[in-house]
Amino acid sequence: MHSKSLSATLALTSLTVGLGLTSTARADFIEDSKLSLGMRNFFFNADNHSGGADQKEWAQGFKLDYISGFTEGTVGFGVDLEGMLGLHLDGGKGMHPAINTFTPSKSDGSAESTWASAGATVKARFSKSEIRYGNTLTPNLPILVANDGRLQLQTFEGGMITSKEIDNLTLTGGQIESVKGRASTNSTGLSVSGATHGSNKFRFAGGDWKVNKDLTLQYYYANLENFYSQNFLGLVHVLPITNDS
């Protein structure tokens, strides 16, 4: 029900934006758009020394991305679309654990031969700030990183705002409500390892201050409801290496 509601909302929003575009706005919305197709061939071999079954599987993945530009005006609107397809190529009986991070499983525990998912994120831009809401978010923050270490990318559902109104300072905040795993086509609540329940509220806020071209200071606060709160302090320093070093 939640996924259907989100899809309907995104479709209605996209339609509303499209009907209200001027010819100039359409040019920026379309001409600044990008369409890309990514392909990944992945062989996974896990030798389980703890006593469980080994995992040996081979699969092919496809990822189609459409990233629109923004409409003209004080507030610009856009939409990003994403589709992912997985094809299971090989992996015999006993080589596919029912619970894994590579390919989804059927009810009998065997690997799905094909699986697919699609999503969308609507976005708005005002001055040097952007707001995004949808189920294709891939944050890359000290307190939350979308994992891309398997055949398909992990994606999150929720809302994020990024502001660069102040020179050399990037502020980020938002709320994540669910996550789609790398071996899944469905979204679930967020959790931690070993937990028996999930949460639909991961709230965060923070910023990156670029002190100079080589030094960045970071602070982020995050809270996963019913699980934990976190304060993160970071320092990123780039040390240039030249031929004279």
Regions found by a protein language model. Name each.
Residues 47-55, 105-113, 144-150, 190-198, ...:
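Outer-membrane beta-barrel domain signature
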Residues 62-69, 120-126, 157-166, 194-213, ...:
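Feature captures outer-membrane beta-barrel proteins of Gram-negative bacteria and organelles
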Residues 48-53, 90-95, 142-151, 182-190, ...:
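Outer-membrane beta-barrel translocator domains and adjoining extracellular loop/strand segments
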Residues 16-138, 163:
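Beta-barrel outer-membrane channel/assembly domains of diderm bacteria
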Residues 37-41, 79-83, 131-135, 173-177, ...:
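Transmembrane beta-barrel strands of outer-membrane/channel proteins
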Residues 35, 73-77, 128-132, 168-172, ...:
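Repeated loop/turn-to-beta-strand initiation elements of outer-membrane beta-barrel proteins
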Residues 56, 126, 138, 150-153, ...:
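Solvent-exposed loop/turn segments connecting transmembrane beta-strands
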Residues 42-48, 84-88, 138-147, 176-182, ...:
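Sequence/structural signature of outer-membrane beta-barrel proteins
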